[in-house]
């Protein structure tokens, strides 16, 4: 009986200790919109690599869950002419994810064409990546 309580106590401690780390990813990604808006490619690279290393997730795993003023990260970069950050985000995404419709049912390419961003540096990087 004592062993059962001991194992249960250890399991509860492990669960309590691991809970804060799940919430930390949100804190780590809290300022990513500002980083993209400021076109800070170096800081963006650090942020993405930190999240990848600490939480074992890739950009494509959390990309759809982040919105900046109602836009995804790449759309946000296009809207603010954050060319270096936008091109970096495109290089980090899988081609298949770049072709997926986003929340409004449009792909990044369709949205960029409709909003006049396809001819800019980020649009060019997108077209090059999509082949």
PLM ranges: what are they?
Residues 32, 73-74, 108-109:
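Conserved hydrophobic residue in the first alpha-helix
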